[in-house]
From Swiss-Prot:
Keyword Amino-acid biosynthesis in annotation: no
Induction: Expressed in the late phase of the viral replicative cycle.
Name of the featured protein: Pre-protein VI
Naturally occurring in which organism (per UniProt): Snake adenovirus serotype 1 (SnAdV-1)
Note: All late proteins expressed from the major late promoter are produced by alternative splicing and alternative polyadenylation of the same gene giving rise to non-overlapping ORFs. A leader sequence is present in the N-terminus of all these mRNAs and is recognized by the viral shutoff protein to provide expression although conventional translation via ribosome scanning from the cap has been shut off in the host cell.
Segments for region (Involved in endosomal membrane lysis): 29-50
Length: 223
């Protein structure tokens, strides 16, 4: 790949901020890089394909292939694979038969270990042992005597209650008077209108603009 493609070309516009970066028009081209990579890969593939074809068509390779086929190596490998598969099948069958035999022996052993049926003498002994004397009944607990009910208190009817009348000469004691504090007025801050920000000078007005100031649309050319 030519290194001259990485440098800007004379007479073409430059859109980058600094000379020599990849943003410049006419600088580094991704399309040329992709085409060069694809051409290199195609050349490597064609070279490998032609080399393999030449080796396959050579006389030495043909003789080696015929000798390999006549030696019977493939037949021996096939027979060995068949014997291996048959031996694995026999091993699996023997394993399954041994597991079934173990389960059968375990089931028969559990049946033999069960207790024999009870005889008449054993049944009679069990009945005699169960017919034991019951414990003597506990003494009867006397019933508790209910406590006497207290007499009901007759309530006073509301009509019979009379308020106490005080004599006119007797004064009523009153506490000191407490003056309640007057509520303070809550000062609500008035809404003041905000002052509009005024622009002072063209410099502050151009700060919010995008680009490089006044000349952000200008073009620079490579020389």
């Amino acid at each position: 790949m030519a290194y001259s493609r990485l440098a800007p070309h004379c007479g073409l516009p430059v859109y980058g901020h600094h000379i020599g970066n990849s943003e410049m028009s006419g600088g580094f081209s991704w399309s040329s890089l992709g085409s060069s990579l694809s051409s290199g890969l195609s050349r490597i593939g064609s070279f490998l394909g032609s080399t393999a074809q030449r080796i396959g068509n050579s006389q030495g390779f043909q003789q080696a292939k015929e000798g390999f086929l006549k030696s019977g190596v493939l037949e021996n490998v096939g027979s060995l694979a068949g014997q291996t598969v048959s031996s694995l099948a026999d091993i699996g069958r023997l394993k399954l038969e041994s597991d079934l035999q173990k389960l059968r022996e375990r089931a028969l052993g559990a049946q033999q270990q069960q207790l024999p049926p009870l005889t008449q003498e054993q049944l009679a002994q069990l009945l005699a042992s169960t017919q034991t004397e019951l414990p003597s009944s506990a003494p009867a607990v006397p019933m508790p005597i209910p406590a006497p009910v207290p007499p009901l208190v007759t309530g006073v009817r509301p009509g019979q209650m009379r308020p106490e009348v005080l004599p006119p000469d007797r004064g009523v004691a009153l506490g000191p008077l407490i003056e309640e504090p007057a509520p303070r007025p809550i000062a609500v801050p008035g809404s003041r209108p905000r002052k509009r920000k005024r622009v002072r000078g063209w410099g502050s007005a151009l700060e919010d603009m995008l680009g490089d100031g006044v000349c952000y649309r200008s073009k620079r050319y490579c020389y």
